[in-house]
Amino acid sequence: LKYKQKQVIDNLTRIGKIQMEEVLPILGSEHTQFYRNKLEFTFSNKKWLTEEQVQSGESFDCMNGVGFHIPGMFDKVLDIHKCWLQDDISNRIRLAIKDYCLTHEGYPFFDLRNQEGFIRTLMIRTASTGDLMVVVVFFHEDKERREALLSYVAEQFPEITSLQYVINGKCNDTITDQEILVYKGKDHIIEEMEGLKFKVGPKSFYQTNSAQAYNLYKIARSFAQLTGNELVYDLYTGTGTIANFVSR
């Protein structure tokens, strides 16, 4: 946080030519593990190998992996066994889907370089209300195998309140222009903040650290010193959390 603050101050003073007499310290998040409410994982048939693994000479029969992209290597992912960023339910869902695809015929992990495969990406959203959203993205339609996988997920994790899927045959992984279909449950989850309830869908922008967003909004509202007679514009809004929050 110290170096992040230094960078911000440098950008404002050296580049922006803004004179600043005092800069308050960054208020760090109390929680540094399991704090995210949204994660996206990529299925790849080319998992990243460490330098030690490459030098070992060991033969890796299965190169399938589910995890995050390696910087500078668009077609490789870091195969994650335990992610410390989101509630543990996220780990259990990801590993269950991975295991199902590896042990059942017809679920090849996506080849990003050659644009081949079936199972592509996975999005998991959690909420403080207990709602849970899972979105599975496939490269092409295979109704029998798609329904088999989604039914398995629904049966194994009844706590999922929104189970959805996407057929994305494009070269890139973005789903903002894709139709998202509901397999079971609702098309959204509900997040709550200070009595306000927000509908969050697969394409919604909502601060990924709910607890820290609440702290941020409280401080911003305090700094604004609103009396109730002002007109506030939320010019770069996502889900509308800030506008609704300060309106109280």
What are these regions (language model features)?
Residues 1-248:
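Accessory RNA-recognition modules of RNA-modification enzymes
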